[in-house]
């Protein structure tokens, strides 16, 4: 959507003009590489990811497939990113949970770096949680230059979100 493209344009403009730090949120910037000090429980290999009900390179496509890497399932029709936190039959918590889907409401900030689409929201996958409460997410979306990216959320940022526990 136009608003999503504008949001990404604003993010990348700020990113490029500030040397890679938007300076707005305290979390880390968006990066295609695993941030320093973090590890993944399983490597990401998108070559086997399917796109039957979620469009390729959308946040929903990536999160659904990444969860399957861990044997975790979400419904084939969970809706847009903001809809995941509203789906019946799933436990939803505001406590960051490893290997859960983190659902961002429409317009909600994503780690102080950019805002989720005002209509569709966003969804990402929780890769790790540090003892200081910071959270590593992996995510995809058509506005990113790579198939997936990583981003670190501070404890304060992470506490404002909804974590959907898969089955």
What is the predicted role of each segment?
Residues 11-17:
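C-terminal edge beta-strand
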Residues 9, 136, 146-148:
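Surface-exposed loop/edge segments in extracytoplasmic proteins
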Residues 4-10:
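Short, exposed coil/turn segments at beta-strand boundaries within extracellular/luminal domains
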Residues 142-144:
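Short coil/turn motifs at secondary-structure junctions
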Residues 17-21, 128:
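Extracellular interdomain linker/stem segments of modular secreted and single-pass surface proteins
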Residues 146-167:
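Intrinsically disordered, low-complexity, charged/polar segments
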Residues 25-131, 135-140:
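Secreted/periplasmic proteins that engage bacterial cell-wall peptidoglycan
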